[in-house]
Amino acid sequence: GVIALEESSVMLGEVVVKADLPATRLTGNVMVTTVAGSVLSKAGTANDVLAKIPLVTGGDGNFKVFGRGAPVIYINGRKVTDASSLEQLSSEDIKSVEVISNPGPQYPADVNAVIRIKTLPPKGEGFSLSAYSNTMLATFARNSENLDLKYRVGGLEVFANGYFYGGKWRFHDISALTTYGPQVFDQQVEAYTTPVSRNLYGKLGFNYQAGQNHSFGAYYQAGKSRVSLKGTVDTRVTSDGAPYESLWQWNDGDETELPDHNANVYYNGSFGKLSVDFNGDFLQTETSKSSTKVETGGLAPDQVVLTDAVNRSRMWAEKLVLSYPLWKGSIEVGEEFTDSRVSYNSVYHGAGISGGDTEIKESGIAAFAEMSQSFGPVQLGVGLRYEHVRYRYFEGGMLDNDLSRTYDNWFPSLTASAQAGQVGLSFNFTSRTRRPSYRQLDGTVEYINRYSYQAGNPALKPTRMYTAQLMAQWRYFFAQAIYNHENNSVFYTTERYENDPLVKLVIFENVPLYRQFQFAVGAQPTVGCWSTQPTVGIFCSFYTTEFLGREKRLDKPFLYLNWSNTVTLPKGWTVDADFMAQTAGHGQNCYIKATSYLNIGVSKRFFNDSFSVKLEARDIFDTANERVTMYNGDILVSTANYQGSRNLRLTLRYRLNASRSKYRGTGAGSSEKDRL
């Protein structure tokens, strides 16, 4: 959409052009999209808004920034820890969305991209209610319900939220695993899985505004979920092209998350020119898993494999940030502390593996500083982050000194931006690290079927990343180029288990060098009632591996097109059409086949926008599927995952005296929550 503004020169260092200023503008190294007052404000929820932001794709809480992977998402500085938070936030409450493709020192060193959602200032007092219901129909039906209540009087706000999600869906996965050696073994695997999910979450909190300069508050959130899975796996094995063995497996599993606990306390205020932001967080989860796998056929006797597993995690975190005006800009300093522990316990009956008993304890402290200065149309910024991490790995209750480590790292950053006429330019460089997730570090071998096991790798090293980014904007056109250099990047791979050519172990490994380059250009014009946003890009990765004794270069680029369209009609009608297409190309040690989707939606608003109805058809041609071929030494793995992405959706939303939350807690330990 187009925001009508008067002609202005530089404002707060942002790229500001004339009255045809588009919804998205370049501010330093941040792409800022204005939602309030644009067609995006009528999109529905935060999920619907993010799907239309430049360089962002995805939906239902699972988003990717072009070439950067999954971002960390914040709402008013508070990290989003579950997808329901985006579904609960109405697009009419959103002021702007900021996309940072190369975050600076104020964010943990393992964060590749950040999306910051800012809401409009709260207004009004008294009681308010917001409710929605979303029904999705694919092979089966799924439903989500949300109720949001607030009460305000004076500087006090009390809020409560309830969220339910449940339903049934179906996965269809096809795999081919070929092992080359004296004999060529080929395994064709076809699996059908039907999960049934029920999730219930509740949240209660308060916020108090003490005058103009101080606010504090707290919230507590608890939830419980259960997923039941039933399915079949049909495996056919050939040796040098001749039939060798056939195996059929029936699965019945259950995964229950005991009531998890998530709490936050915060203080936000100012003392003269000094701004203070403090947050403390606690997170605790426990998940129990049980499964029964019945395997018949094949050369080995029939068998029944029983699995019982429990995963527990706990985290404490706090973060303090101080900012102060300095000369022609400002300086920001802060520290962050996290203390986490994760345990994995599993027992197998009837399988050739015994399970495991592992525990990981990790504590870390970080300090960071960033200074920015303005010199006319030019802005310069420098930053530095220091992280000290102590990692301890326990097996069977005993400390493994060989797998325990201590890290001390410095991460510098540099930012420069300028405006030359109607052209805005920005350059930034960062040095970061990405530590493996706790699941990637868990060495317990997990049983999938007679021929397939899965495990983490406790010997994994952190990935060191160096990233340079150049961005530009002219009127409603924008462009971005990023180069990324990684040492010790973590790849998925497959290897023989105990040298058995038929049994595969899916595991993670470090690779010495992995490089990426990406370039994208797009526009956001508006013609009458039609707002359109085409973006085209190219993504290249550079990696060389060994396959079948020969060097294999994996450097075929992806071509990318994302085209969002909104037509605003009289009497509250809106029509949306979004198209995405990506050609085949290489990424890491994989060849990823082409994928695409087309979504069309129609919405209508009633009663002064207090009630709305939206009907959507997602992935109309059922082409948003994942098809990947992975190269691993003498093993070739091809997979095709059909997730049932084609569906119909009906969303109803009602708002009574709707008001925005004053809660200003930003959260601590955001990166650690993701790893947990």
Task: Locate predicted features.
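Short acidic/polar hinge/loop motifs at secondary-structure boundaries
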Residues: 78-104
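Short, acidic, small-residue-rich periplasmic hinge/interaction motif at the N-terminus
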Residues: 2-39, 59-60, 68, 100-102
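N-terminal periplasmic accessory domains that precede
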Residues: 2-5, 18, 46-49, 83-84, ...
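Outer-membrane beta-barrel translocator/receptor signature
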Residues: 108-115, 123-173, 197-200
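Face-selective signature of the C-terminal outer-membrane beta-barrel domain
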Residues: 201-225, 251-396, 419, 423-424, ...
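Surface-exposed extracellular loop regions of Gram-negative outer-membrane beta-barrel proteins
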Residues: 118-131, 172-176, 188, 200-204, ...
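Outer-membrane beta-barrel signature, preferentially recognizing the C-terminal barrel domain
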Residues: 359-362, 402-405, 433-487, 504-518, ...
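Extracytoplasmic beta-strand/coil segments of soluble accessory domains associated
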Residues: 47-79
